[in-house]
């Protein structure tokens, strides 16, 4: 959540950031501006009434001590108190309206984030590893998965519905091996391995920014204040919800393997075949909680950590800087890692590493103490990696002419 003080003191800065994102809010910015103007006016009136109440109360006290008639002051205090209570209630209601608006306003766009309206305006930073030259036409992963008996798409539909899969046989062993490789790699890079619940309450989803704006994107347990997590970013970040951390403990680096659940609202017709877009998928996540001065360096560190796994698996990939119009709600700056898929003849996202600055920290009340003063931390998150998409990339990049799949050396010890 952005700072309420910033909204009140520099409304134009917030409006400019929303414009960069091509983002709109309910009732429009002008309506919000009107609410803020009215709030400021009433706040001044409230402070004036409070000052008057204090002044008259002192005068009343003096007269009472002197045993002088103070009935006129008493009446004045009673009338002023009625006005004070009414105005205080009105100011409180306006604060709630402003806070509700704040909860659905996305993060401020970082100065490093380029302007743009969609993914078409994202900027390639660099490529890592050269895509292989095939002597045959490479197949897509769903053909290879079925040929090798790695993935049973029909059973996924039978057990649940579309966008669910069953991984079995040697494919299940490869899938498990990928998870072990990712966790081991992350641990070597200083990230603590943590296993968390796959269900969280509403407060936790508010903390990381999924609620209230994106309620339709998450699965809610009927008759419970519980939701299936869309990413371990939610649980790892919120381990420190409403916590004051000693500055000596920063940075805090965590990694978790969890199932993730997404409704994929608005994705009808996209990636209907295969494992690219699923309602349930496994992901190994990185989350870091840092001192504000260290978050930029941490973002680079997390990118290189995720990239290191792809290098070990001999998978060509690239770094892409997201433009302002393609940023996620909580992100101030995001760099995607896209992996090469020869079957699709294109790069596809396999990780997003985002710096949310103090946006999530303010929502989740995550602070650190330095020089006897509490300040907001910075939080970062990124996939390291999406397991299903990594297996997709492995199948497509390491396929052989006969349809078999070569296993990279980095995975051998896990199989």
From Swiss-Prot:
Q: Where is this protein found?
A: Cytoplasm
Record GO biological process: selenocysteine biosynthetic process; seryl-tRNA aminoacylation
Q: What is its EC number?
A: 6.1.1.11
Cite the Pfam families for this sequence: Seryl_tRNA_N, tRNA-synt_2b
Annotated binding of ATP, by residue: 262-264, 349-352
* Functional pathway: Aminoacyl-tRNA biosynthesis; selenocysteinyl-tRNA(Sec) biosynthesis; L-seryl-tRNA(Sec) from L-serine and tRNA(Sec): step 1/1
Q: Could you tell me what this protein does?
A: Catalyzes the attachment of serine to tRNA(Ser). Is also able to aminoacylate tRNA(Sec) with serine, to form the misacylated tRNA L-seryl-tRNA(Sec), which will be further converted into selenocysteinyl-tRNA(Sec).
The identity of this protein, by name, is: Serine--tRNA ligase
Which organism is the protein's source?
A: Helicobacter acinonychis (strain Sheeba)
Source gene? serS
């Amino acid at each position: 959540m952005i700072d309420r003080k910033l909204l009140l003191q520099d409304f134009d800065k917030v409006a400019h950031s929303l414009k960069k994102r091509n983002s709109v809010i309910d009732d429009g910015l002008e309506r919000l501006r009107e609410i803020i103007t009215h709030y400021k006016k009433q706040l001044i009136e409230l402070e004036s009434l409070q000052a008057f109440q204090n002044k008259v109360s002192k005068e009343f006290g003096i007269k009472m001590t002197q045993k002088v008639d103070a009935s006129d002051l008493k009446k004045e205090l009673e009338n002023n108190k009625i006005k004070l209570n009414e105005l205080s209630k009105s100011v409180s209601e306006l604060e709630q309206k402003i806070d509700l608006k704040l909860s659905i306003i996305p993060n401020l766009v970082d100065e490093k984030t380029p302007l743009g309206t969609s993914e078409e305006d994202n900027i390639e930073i660099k490529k890592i590893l050269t895509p292989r030259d095939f002597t045959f036409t490479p197949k897509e992963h769903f053909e290879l998965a079925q040929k090798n008996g790695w993935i049973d798409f029909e059973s996924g539909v039978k057990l649940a519905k579309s966008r669910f899969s069953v991984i079995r046989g040697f494919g299940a062993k490869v899938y498990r091996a990928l998870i072990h490789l990712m966790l081991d790699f992350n641990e070597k890079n200083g990230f603590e391995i943590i296993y968390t619940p796959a269900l969280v309450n509403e407060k936790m989803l508010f903390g990381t920014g999924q609620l209230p704006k994106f309620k339709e994107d998450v699965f809610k347990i009927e008759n419970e204040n519980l939701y299936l997590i869309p990413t371990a970013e939610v649980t790892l970040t919120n381990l420190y919800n409403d916590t004051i951390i000693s500055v000596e403990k920063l940075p805090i680096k965590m990694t978790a393997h969890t199932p993730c659940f997404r409704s994929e609202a608005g994705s009808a017709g996209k990636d209907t075949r295969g494992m690219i877009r699923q309602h349930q998928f496994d992901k190994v996540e990185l989350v870091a909680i840092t001192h504000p001065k260290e978050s930029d360096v941490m973002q680079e560190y997390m990118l290189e950590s995720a990239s290191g796994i792809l290098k070990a698996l001999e998978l060509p990939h690239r770094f892409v800087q997201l433009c302002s119009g393609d940023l996620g709600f909580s992100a101030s700056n995001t760099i995607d890692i896209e992996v090469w898929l020869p079957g699709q003849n294109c790069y596809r996202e396999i990780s997003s590493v985002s710096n949310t600055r103090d946006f999530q920290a303010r929502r989740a009340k995550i602070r650190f103490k330095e020089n006897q003063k509490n300040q907001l931390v910075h939080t970062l998150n990124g996939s390291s990696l999406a397991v299903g998409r990594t297996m997709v990339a492995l199948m497509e990049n390491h396929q052989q002419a006969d349809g078999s799949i070569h296993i990279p050396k980095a995975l051998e010890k896990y199989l």
